[in-house]
Amino acid sequence: MMEERQSPVSGENHLPDETSEKRTIRPVKVGSVLLLFFLLVIWPLSSYLLMKGQQPQLSATGSQGIDLSTQIYLPTILIELFVFLLITLVLRLERESFSSIGLKGFDLRNLLIGALFWFGMSLFLMLTSYLLRSYNLSTSPDVLRLLPRTTPQRSLWIMMATSASLAEESAFRGFVLTRLNLYLKNWWLTILIASISFSSGHLYQGTAGAFFAGIYGIFFSLLFLWRKSLVPCMTAHFLQDVTPLFSPLS
């Protein structure tokens, strides 16, 4: 799965099994490099600071102290959509297709694989959480106060989960993995960097929350390299994000 094979680099050929040591070095594209820096550094840092800035107010007053819809959910949705628009803009400027970042394979098989992946990962992380608790590495309790309380809030939460599954998978799996590896030429290093960046944006959830996000990032990356499609990753990501609506302790 992780081996490189020959194929020219264009369009869909950014995907994992289609690189080659014998091809000519791909010229640096400024748009891709700037977007990689934004996705790997700026976005995770800004997400962390945004959520961290709300925690003192959450700790002091609970969810009643802030308007979850306007201060958390809507800003998050807008940021996710902005990121996806940036990816779209860079793809258009560089004359690339959405399929070049894995936005293809919208079929029942990939949907089912994504659902099964989510179920398996949920069981794995549930068992892992018991080990983390023994070392007092629990998720920040303030995070639970971000969960919706009303029907309109739940609707926004679902919209937020949808936008996150689209934007974050397109960014950290689709764009970062395919573009960064063109320069690093090492899938394991590429996966590690992408997963650390993905994890750092979840530090506001505490050590355990960031750890789980990093683990998810690694397995999402492997799933993407296997299926060469973001559909299973987006499906699993969406299910993971909406699960707290039915089981807050998850």
What are these regions (language model features)?
Residues 124, 128, 163, 176, ...:
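Hydrophobic/aromatic residues in alpha-helical transmembrane segments
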Residues 166-171, 175-176, 200, 204, ...:
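Active-site His/Glu-centered metal-binding helix of metallohydrolases
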Residues 1-100, 245-250:
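N-terminal, membrane-interfacial amphipathic/helix-forming hydrophobic leader that caps
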Residues 33, 73-74, 111-116, 154-158, ...:
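Hydrophobic alpha-helical transmembrane segments
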